[in-house]
Amino acid sequence: MFTWSGLYESINLGYDAIKVASYDCASFRFIKEIKKYWDKIFVSTGATYEHEIEKTVNILEGSDYHLLHCVTIYPTKLNQLHLSRMEQLRKYNENIGFSDHTKPYETGLIASKLAIWLGASCIERHFTILDENLTKDGPVSINPHQLNELSEFGGYDKLKQKEIIEDEFPSWQASLGNPDRKLSTEELMNRDYYRGRFASSLENKVVNNWENFAKP
């Protein structure tokens, strides 16, 4: 979900869950409105300060919400993942996932596999049936074969998962990073760019996601 107009257009489409992008984790009025219509809500927490995540968690209390750790660098390198951050997010909720923007054709599925082994309850990946070079997000998208591989990995026990990880990425601990890490300059620049990228035209007004707007 990227805009107010998209929110209202989606209400009657029959979806029982909705996903909020990292750049709207701090769009508090937007999230309040989403909570009115959906109980199951996935929220990425990339490029978001701790006090903003806390406020969003307070808004979502009482719903079936999932927080996704995310690094908003496209593509994300394996040493930029800070996957130990997932454990830090568990102070808010046990439903913690990972939004993965690594390049599968360079680093495989190791980032998602590592997150699953570390206890992620859900994984978000861009998905395509096209060649990786045909779309803007193709380089960070997985194809049906890779999706099947990831699904199979999720069905293995923890011991087998660890064996696979250590075989594919012996230096996996480099991806754990710092649970209290600071947002990087690149993430903050992306926050400024993407937060202002989408707006809605509603009731003859241009409305950004972080602004107060709600249909009566």
Which ranges hold each PLM region?
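Catalytic cores and adjacent flexible loops of soluble metabolic enzymes
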Residues: 1-216
